[in-house]
């Protein structure tokens, strides 16, 4: 799937949010953390990821376009908090007490681990499989592993091997 183009006005709003939150953090923490690089190449159902060693934030362009205000207000500071926590505390739990403190006390944003965006447009195709108690939907990746003989999957409820439906 081709990555959608983000209009310049939205890119500017994302950058403004990033810079405002970073400036607040630098002021409150009395530090001068460098501005991270923004990349609009996150795919799948993740809204964003923070690449700690690269000081980079990857954002999902599809979810950004569909949820502009909430995305800018929540996802941008969420990923920035991961980078700041790593630089301030070192390696700690991704959504642990340090991250929660950074989100709420430093950035002034509610600490939510996951987004609540509609995912229909980014959810990948699934393949129906069956056990004796229910139907399951396997992702393309898992389905291909089954087809190649690299993996088998069992139902967590009944323990049966999952079999592709015809």
Swiss-Prot record:
Binding annotation for Zn(2+): 78, 82
Keywords from the named record: Cytoplasm, Metal-binding, Zinc
Cofactors, names only: Zn(2+)
Co-factor note (free text): Binds 1 zinc ion.
Main location: cytoplasm
Keyword Ribosomal protein: no
Pfam families: SprT-like, Zn_ribbon_SprT
InterPro entries listed in its UniProt record: SprT-like_domain (IPR006640), SprT_Zn_ribbon (IPR035240), Uncharacterised_SprT (IPR023483)
Biological processes per GO annotation: response to stress
Active site positions, chain numbering: 79
Subcellular location: Cytoplasm
Annotated SprT-like domain residues: 20-164
Record-level Gene Ontology MF annotations: zinc ion binding
GO cellular component, one term: cytoplasm
Superkingdom of the source species: Bacteria
Family membership: Belongs to the SprT family.
PANTHER family according to UniProt: PROTEIN SPRT
Protein name per the record: Protein SprT
Native species: Klebsiella pneumoniae subsp. pneumoniae (strain ATCC 700721 / MGH 78578)
Gene field: sprT
């Amino acid at each position: 799937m081709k990555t959608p183009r983000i209009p310049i006005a939205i890119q500017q709003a994302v950058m403004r949010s990033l810079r405002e939150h970073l400036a607040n953090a630098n002021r409150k923490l009395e530090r001068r953390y460098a501005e991270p690089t923004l990349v609009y190449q996150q795919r799948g159902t993740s809204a964003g990821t923070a690449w700690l060693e690269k000081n980079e934030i990857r954002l999902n362009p599809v979810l950004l376009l569909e949820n502009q205000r909430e995305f800018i207000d929540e996802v941008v500071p969420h990923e920035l908090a991961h980078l700041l926590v790593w630089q301030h505390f070192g390696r700690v739990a991704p959504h642990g007490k340090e991250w929660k403190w950074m989100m709420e006390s430093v950035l002034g944003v509610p600490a939510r681990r996951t987004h609540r965006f509609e995912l229909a447009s980014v959810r990948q195709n699934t393949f129906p499989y069956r056990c004796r108690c229910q139907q399951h939907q396997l992702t393309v990746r898992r389905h291909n592993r089954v087809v190649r003989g690299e993996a088998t999957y069992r139902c967590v409820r009944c323990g049966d091997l999952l079999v592709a439906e015809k």
